[in-house]
Amino acid sequence: ARVLTDDFLPAVEAAKAAGFNHFEAGGGARYQALYLYCREDAFDMMDRFRATVGPDVNLQTLARGVNVVGLDSQSSDVIDAHAKLFKKHGITTIRNFDALNDVNNLIYSGQCIHNAGLKHEVVVALMALPPGCEGAHTPEFYVGRLKSILDADLPFSSVCFKDASGTTTPAVVYDTIKAARALLGPDVHIQIHAHET
């Protein structure tokens, strides 16, 4: 996240020239790092990213539910302004998650994303428990969270199962996605995102 815009835009140009049409342009850490470490404005970076890839490329960022790009819960006016400002500065999709899978923390932020005219990629957060532990992190639990999203009538364009810890097993991912596909039908785009560091 602590990379100067001038240093990474040549790579974006090369990826665009190679035919890429979807980029993750940032998230909470990228937004914060520009101000805290790089002495750059996050909105200037978004504008330059958009200018580099052109008008037709999907630019995506990440939001932390009611925290949006902050580390604490934000007021409703800040959550709404976040969606509107990111739209204004060229973002087209926001992947919206709550690390504890509290659907209530996705409802207002997701509605703001949708109302701003952005694509809302709603997230179910995945992880594995330590060896020897049993509990909530099963395909049944994750599909239950997805059902809660559907029951909340939360508008979304796509669904992402996000494993930020990089610990979920392939079997859990397979069973979760298979059940989610049966629940969502064939037309909803499902994304799996994992941090495999």
What are these regions (language model features)?
Residues 15, 96, 159:
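Conserved, mostly hydrophobic/aromatic
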Residues 1-25, 33-34:
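Conserved N-terminal beta1-alpha1 strand-loop-helix module at the mouth
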Residues 17-20, 91, 154-156:
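A structural motif
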Residues 52-55, 115-118, 152-154, 182-188:
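Short helix-capping segments at alpha-helix termini
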Residues 164-197:
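Catalytic alpha/beta core domains of metabolic enzymes, predominantly
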